[in-house]
Every structure is written in structure tokens, then in C-alpha cells.
A protein has these predicted regions:
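Phosphate-binding active sites in nucleotide-utilizing proteins
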Residues: 2
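Substrate-binding/catalytic cleft of secreted carbohydrate-active enzymes
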Residues: 5-182
Length: 182
């Protein structure tokens, strides 16, 4: 079935899972316990002063504490290839500081964050990977053919709603076609 990697979405998992992945050679994206889905804007507009954690200084200590806790608990697990800053928490200076924390503590592992997609001006400052959720295959192909300066991971897709796994073969065909896509 060609599965060799997992993402611990949307927060760290039970410790036995990490030991199992270490033992069986399964690569992991270890995701920080941070999700602020639904608090990105007000009145249907994106507003940097409203985003949580965004660039709001009051959220910096809390988000860094979550990154530090995850790092200290999981740093010795060999299965972890990538640290993830969290899930659907928009983007901003606070997340840039989390990215920098992981890089300072563990320069040999990659950093992942999907939310940078929403504000491309942060792409040069965080995440080693271009990552999106529920992107259409045509958008993935467009990135891989025109912009591919970072590997692309579709970190969440085929949600079991609506078409319920319909079209999976289209995503799998792209994986076979492009080396920079997982």
C-alpha cells in the first residue's frame, strides 16, 4: 500500500505510537498541539489583529510552551523526520517564532506548517515544505510544474465526507508522476 509516513494530526498521539513507528521504520510528522481553526478573522475578513495566535504577542508564550513541551517529550524518537507547528492556525509572527525554536533545538530535522499557504509572504521564513489541505489535483500539478522550490505534501485530504474517497486514484497518480510530491 506504499504507506511509509504519518502525520500526528492535530496534536501529539499516545507515546506507544511513537515507539511503534521507531521500531517499524515509519516516518513521522510530529504535530504540535495547536489548532485555532475558526478564529482567523471577523466578519468574514482576514485580519492580522484578529488571528489567533497570528502576530498577537499575548499568544507567544503559550504557543512556544506547546512547542517546547512536544520537543522535550519526543526529541529522542528516531521516527520523527519533521516537526509540525500545528494545524489550521493561520500564520503570523508567533508561528515564525515556533519555527525558529524547532530549528534552533533540532537543526537536522525539517519543519512543516500548512497554514503558511494563506500568507505567502511568510514562505521564506517558515516551513521547509509546501503543504496544503484538500487541494485540487490541478492545483498540486500547477505548483509542481511552476513553483516547486520546496517539496509538496498534501498533509490532509480525502476527508471521509461528501464523495467519501472518490477520486483517490488522481492523487495517487500525481505521487507516481512527481518526485517532489508526497
Amino acid at each position: 500500500n506504499h504507506i511509509n509516513a504519518v502525520r500526528t494530526c492535530h496534536y501529539p498521539d499516545q507515546i506507544p505510537w511513537y515507539y511503534l513507528c521507531d521500531k517499524e521504520g515509519i516516518y513521522m510528522i510530529a504535530e504540535t498541539n495547536l489548532e485555532t481553526h475558526g478564529s482567523w478573522g471577523k466578519a468574514a475578513t482576514l485580519d492580522d489583529t484578529w488571528n489567533v495566535p497570528g502576530s498577537v504577542p499575548e499568544w507567544e508564550a503559550m504557543t512556544l510552551d506547546r512547542a517546547k513541551t512536544q520537543f522535550e517529550v519526543l526529541k529522542n524518537h528516531t521516527a520523527i523526520l519533521i516537526w509540525s507547528l500545528g494545524n489550521e492556525s493561520f500564520v503570523g509572527e508567533t508561528l515564525c517564532k515556533m519555527d525558529q525554536y524547532y530549528r534552533n533545538q533540532d537543526p537536522d530535522r525539517l519543519v512543516h506548517y500548512e497554514g503558511v499557504f494563506w500568507q505567502p509572504e511568510y514562505k521564506s521564513r517558515m516551513s521547509d515544505i509546501e503543504s496544503r489541505m484538500y487541494a485540487y489535483p490541478k492545483d498540486i500539478r500547477e505548483y509542481l510544474e511552476k513553483e516547486a522550490d520546496k517539496p509538496f505534501i498534501l498533509c490532509e485530504y480525502m476527508h471521509d465526507m461528501g464523495n467519501s474517497m472518490g477520486g483517490l486514484n488522481t492523487y495517487m497518480n500525481l505521487i507516481d508522476e512527481y518526485d517532489m510530491y508526497q
